[in-house]
Amino acid sequence: MIPDIALVYANTPTFNGIKTYSKNLYVGLKQEGMDARLYAKKQIELRINGKKYFGWASSEVLSHIYQYHGKRITHATADWEINKHTNVLTIHDLTQYHEWLRGLTSLSPHIQKHFSWLFQRISDIKIITPSRHVEDQIRYVLPDADISVITIEVNPPLLRTETNWENPYPDDGKLHLVTMGEIYNKRKRIRDLYEFVKDRKDVTLHHIGMMTDEFRAYSPNIIPLGQVDELTKLSHLKFADKFIFYTKDEGQGIPTMEAMRCNTQVIVNDIPIHRELLGDRPYYFHDKEEFLDLLYKPKKTGLVEQISQYDNWIEKHIQAYNEVKE
């Protein structure tokens, strides 16, 4: 039976924010009594020396083969999942495309073709985006696009249940920092972060995310945790002295918001998306010296409250669906 709302996403083998968004959106819609179904489309990945190939490109191919659709709404939760039935699309960011326009990066012919096709296809469908920052990126290309800005709720189920939390960090008098992201992801500036903290005797950096062999023994005070389960991830966020996120750009930045939901102080680099969604609750840095000074600052108040303001996201998605043109 065809559902009223079809959510189509790529079932990637590793953690990513789009996967979390898709699953949480589905659960939220069902809790509101909506006739929704989640279609998990397998993503094909090949790894060579820890680096990922194909990935999202394989999603685009499979989207044309498996034409999932709903009676009223077919919502592709990322632009690689769009097909001929799609009438709602979530665009998480267009950073890569805008860097290419400014000559700051190169795009393969396949990626250029993807963006060209995408902008032709989405000119007359409902677009959902998590921030005004991304809305501006889209309007630069499509000034008259039908856009709803809906910041994703970040409230992991484990934080809402009785959980026997255990502190994963040793009581050794050091500052225990944690960060998240894939080491080979060019957008995440984890390698720079490694340089900031390496060999510091009073600081330990714990890194959650995919790792390559060359970085496993980078410094004695950097602990590569690799991929971890949800409980392990949240335990590290919850008990850390600081959560660190250093990135070129984001559509929303879910890991940082997860840390703030855990009432953990975050330190982030000063970019527009952080200012828009996180307000003045983080500590912002611009260089290594400023970053190191911030490690010893006290925790601010209002961290959880800053993130909980986005908890009405399901209501806003339903409103956006009701605005879709027949």
What are these model-derived regions, one by one?
Residues 1-326:
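Carbohydrate transferase catalytic cores enriched for Leloir-type hexosyltransferases
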